[in-house]
């Protein structure tokens, strides 16, 4: 009995060669619409789908493969006699191979000018149905959704006349993953269009971008998946210009660095980061000076760290970056001379190019945190704050320089692990106290790091001070300006202590915990 293949693809890569080889192996080919036209033009003889069904393609191609003569040929169990008898009685011929990929829905909705009606027209109905029918009956039917699998299938057919069960099972799993991901993108698009923010079911789809040697530690397996609808300003979309493949820890650190630099738009800024905490941030009128400030903030911790810049790297800055050991550099661009310096004798230095761009609110995706048995979903902490909304709660008002430093420190604090303290002036961090289980400990770490630079410095806290002892500790260091959310039942005690020591203190009303 002659074997039959059904071919209907949007992605026509390699399809002519596949069809020619199938014909050479003695297969009949059923095809549809544009696929059949492409094959016939290449000299491959096919059977039109409507010649099989006796029913014309209609409604602009919306109805063409949804027919019992097609799906019966896919779903009939070859090992069940009454299935075969039913097929014979109803003139259903068996189909042994399905090669289908789907309308480009994802690519369509990524176009900036796409209309809702055009998007709806790109929802494939017949294609997923064919894939699911073929995949369900993988005991007898081979289903192929990815052009990269054509050589595997042809190789087995040429060698043994059939595909192995293991291959059919693997390809069926791939087909189900493909249709699930396709539907997830459609569901996400319709959910957004309907303005729904809390769907009763959450379907996420990501594409494998990189298989890694290991994860956070060598004993942990890991892979990197990219969101199916790519975020334009993200580590996943960065272009690597030099160096070894990014590690799991590189990607997490780079993501943290990109999130920070996103908040510093107005002036040239450099962020140095280690273990997802900023160890130095500097801003200036030029990128070289901004680097000088970021480096001076903590010249010890930056060793083996990550640096992200929001301006093109010039030659002078590149020479300074090259002088120390870094894991990774991220910038919107590099001059030709700068790139030559950075790559000289540093073939392992990872260099990424990521054009700096402010994101629209609609482009900022939610954050997902896995927990045992579930998933936490929240908006990113990207609330827009204005100093005009802040309240000075002490007798002394901040002067202009203090206000600039407080704004800089407050912008920084939300990217430091809680309990978080940042000491800064108006152009650089001086001390960072991250991740302690009590606020006093974080204060002491930041003060110790900033020793000798506290004249005119300010301090930011990501959450309120529960007791006035924090203010006493800050006052003892000589710091005269504080910014914090407020909100403690003992705020009055902290305010009284600040007034006693001549400290100006601002309440923002916004907390910035980071776990």
Swiss-Prot record:
Keywords linked to the UniProt accession: Hydrolase, Multifunctional enzyme, Purine biosynthesis, Transferase
InterPro entries xrefs: AICAR_Tfase_dup_dom_sf (IPR024051), Cytidine_deaminase-like (IPR016193), MGS-like_dom (IPR011607), MGS-like_dom_sf (IPR036914), PurH-like (IPR002695)
GO annotation, biological process: 'de novo' IMP biosynthetic process
Source organism superkingdom: Bacteria
Hydrolase is among the record's keywords: yes
Catalytic activity: (6R)-10-formyltetrahydrofolate + 5-amino-1-(5-phospho-beta-D-ribosyl)imidazole-4-carboxamide = 5-formamido-1-(5-phospho-D-ribosyl)imidazole-4-carboxamide + (6S)-5,6,7,8-tetrahydrofolate; IMP + H2O = 5-formamido-1-(5-phospho-D-ribosyl)imidazole-4-carboxamide
Stored Pfam families: AICARFT_IMPCHas, MGS
Pathway note: Purine metabolism; IMP biosynthesis via de novo pathway; 5-formamido-1-(5-phospho-D-ribosyl)imidazole-4-carboxamide from 5-amino-1-(5-phospho-D-ribosyl)imidazole-4-carboxamide (10-formyl THF route): step 1/1; Purine metabolism; IMP biosynthesis via de novo pathway; IMP from 5-formamido-1-(5-phospho-D-ribosyl)imidazole-4-carboxamide: step 1/1
EC code(s) of this entry: 2.1.2.3, 3.5.4.10
Record has Cell division as a keyword: no
Domain MGS-like residue range list: 1-145
GO cellular component, one term: cytosol
Gene Ontology MF annotations: IMP cyclohydrolase activity; phosphoribosylaminoimidazolecarboxamide formyltransferase activity
Notes on the domains: The IMP cyclohydrolase activity resides in the N-terminal region.
UniProt xrefs under PANTHER family: BIFUNCTIONAL PURINE BIOSYNTHESIS PROTEIN ATIC, BIFUNCTIONAL PURINE BIOSYNTHESIS PROTEIN PURH
Family of this protein: Belongs to the PurH family.
Matching HAMAP family: PurH
UniProt-recorded name of the protein: Bifunctional purine biosynthesis protein PurH
UniProt source species: Streptococcus equi subsp. equi (strain 4047)
Organism placement in taxonomy: Bacteria, Bacillati, Bacillota, Bacilli, Lactobacillales
């Amino acid at each position: 009995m002659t074997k039959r293949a059904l071919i209907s693809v949007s992605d026509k890569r390699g399809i002519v060669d596949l069809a020619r080889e199938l014909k050479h192996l003695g297969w009949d080919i059923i095809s549809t619409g544009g696929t059949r036209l492409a094959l016939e033009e290449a000299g491959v003889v096919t059977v039109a789908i409507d010649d099989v069904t006796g029913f014309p393609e209609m409604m602009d191609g919306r109805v063409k493969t949804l027919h019992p003569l097609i799906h019966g040929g896919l779903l009939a169990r070859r090992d069940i006699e009454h299935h075969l008898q039913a097929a014979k009685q109803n003139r259903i011929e068996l189909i042994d191979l399905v090669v289908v990929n789907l309308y480009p829905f994802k690519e369509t909705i990524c176009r900036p000018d796409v209309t809702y009606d055009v998007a709806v027209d790109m929802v494939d109905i017949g294609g997923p149905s064919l894939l699911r029918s073929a995949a369900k009956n993988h005991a007898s039917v081979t289903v192929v959704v990815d052009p990269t699998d054509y050589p595997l299938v042809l190789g087995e057919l040429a060698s043994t006349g059939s595909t192995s069960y293991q291959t059919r099972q693997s390809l069926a799993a791939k087909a189900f993953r493909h249709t699930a991901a396709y539907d997830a993108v459609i569901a996400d698009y319709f959910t957004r269009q309907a303005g729904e923010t809390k769907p009763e079911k959450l379907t996420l789809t990501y594409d494998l971008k990189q298989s890694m040697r290991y994860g956070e530690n060598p004993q942990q397996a890991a892979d990197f998946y990219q969101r199916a609808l790519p975020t334009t300003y993200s580590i996943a979309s960065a272009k690597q210009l030099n160096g070894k493949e990014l590690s799991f820890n590189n990607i997490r650190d780079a993501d943290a660095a990109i999130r920070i630099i996103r908040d510093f738009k107005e002036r040239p800024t450099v962020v140095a980061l280690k273990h997802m905490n900023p160890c130095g941030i500097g801003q200036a009128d030029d990128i070289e000076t901004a680097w000088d400030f970021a480096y001076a903030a903590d010249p010890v911790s930056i060793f083996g760290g990550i640096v992200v810049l929001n301006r093109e790297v010039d030659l002078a800055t590149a020479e300074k970056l090259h002088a120390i050991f870094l894991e990774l550099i991220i910038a919107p661009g590099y001059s030709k001379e700068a790139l030559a310096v950075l790559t000289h004798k540093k073939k392992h230095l990872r260099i990424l190019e990521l054009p700096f761009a402010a994101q629209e609110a609609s482009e900022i995706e939610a954050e997902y945190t896995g927990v045992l048995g579930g998933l936490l979903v929240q908006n990113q902490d990207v609330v827009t704050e204005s100093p005009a909304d802040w309240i000075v709660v002490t007798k002394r008002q901040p002067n202009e320089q203090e206000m600039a430093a407080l704004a800089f420190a407050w912008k920084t604090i939300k990217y430091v692990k809680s309990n978080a303290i940042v000491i800064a002036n108006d152009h650089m961090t001086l001390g960072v106290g991250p991740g302690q289980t009590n606020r006093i400990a974080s204060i002491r770490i930041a003060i110790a790091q900033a020793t000798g630079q506290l004249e005119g410095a300010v301090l930011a806290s990501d959450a309120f001070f529960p007791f006035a002892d924090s203010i006493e500790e800050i006052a003892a260091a000589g710091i005269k300006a504080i910014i914090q959310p407020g909100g403690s039942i003992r705020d009055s005690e902290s305010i009284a202590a600040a007034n006693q020591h001549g400290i100006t203190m601002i309440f923002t009303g916004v907390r910035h915990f980071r776990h």
